[in-house]
Amino acid sequence: MNAMLKSTDRPISQTYRLALLDLDGVVYRGKNPVEHAADSIRAAQRAGMQVEYTTNNSSRFQRVVAEQLRGFGLDVEPRQVITSSVVAARMVARHVPAGARILVLGAEHLREEVAGQGLTVVDHAEDTPEAVIQGWYPDMTWQQMAEVSYAVERGALYLSLIHIPEPTRLDVIS
């Protein structure tokens, strides 16, 4: 069945109680706010709508993102920012025993989230991790990538938080 969205004259804050807003390109672009985004968010909050923020960026702490949003004049607590690191750590924790070893390749935020779920962060395949979580990390080395490969080859669950772009005429993704 193909459902069509219907238009309405009612403000969105009267139709929905919660807005999950993507950050990158919706609320801000890099360090700069998207024009009118903060005003619209404040209006929705004044009308009683709860606002939460989501991002697939695994490299920044929730508190850092919340601070940036407060700089735009928004009332935001870190718990209102849902990063891919938060989701990944919780997801893996549901699929492995408490205290399980997890090889983490990513920013400190990702490592902290995994440890915060009661899991043991390791750096080497020889530590026999039950899972691997790889986030965006521009400082990763060939050795770290090799450790990820070895762990996955040995049967570790693999979760990547890295966005793979859609192929274009110039891209080849295998």
Where are these regions (language model features)?
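Catalytic-core regions built around general acid/base machinery
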Residues: 36-48, 147-151
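A short, gly/pro- and small-residue-rich
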Residues: 141-162
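Short, well-ordered secondary-structure micro-motifs within conserved domains or adaptor modules
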Residues: 126-143
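Single conserved hydrophobic/aromatic residue that forms the stacking wall/gate
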Residues: 163-174
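Active-site phosphate-binding/coordination module
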Residues: 46-124
